[in-house]
Amino acid sequence: MSTWYEQAIFYHMYPLGITGAPKTNVQTEVTDRFKELDQWIPHIRSLGCNAIYIGPLFESSSHGYDTRDYKLVDRRLGTNNDFCEFTKLCHENGIKVVVDGVFNHTGREFFAFKDIQEKKWDSPYKDWYKGVNFGWQSPLGDPFGYEAWQGHFELPCLNLYNQQVKDYLFDVIRFWVD
């Protein structure tokens, strides 16, 4: 017996792009753009797709892959409840939803990285990131160096060998599954 995803036909949806959301997240108000995604459901069904791979969704500063809060939907897209309503509508139409969770790096505005910027070696999060070195300055002017995703220093790499990081990320996953 195969699992559902082995038979699934996925439609990839990049919500920030498909809805024309602003490129940078400087707004304070929430804009419900999930309603714009609702209209894509008949099209996705007409293609024979029965699953959507959507994301990134988490609160970020720009393109979505620079997460600043894993437990909030990006305010340029709506609220957590708006996303739940979109997911419910997908399920009512026989479409499963899989979220693109960006769990190997964060943005520079993520709470743990900001804490390191502020407290440096006294930060309890200094081991949450790969290659943190207080004897080196980052190309972006931080008083410490760190490993960055593909050399993009606005995307500091999480230390996935750190148990606290793993616990935190599993907590995030449980938050969204519940």
Task: Indicate residue ranges for each PLM-predicted region.
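Substrate-binding/active-site clefts of carbohydrate-active enzymes
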Residues: 3-8, 14-50, 57-178
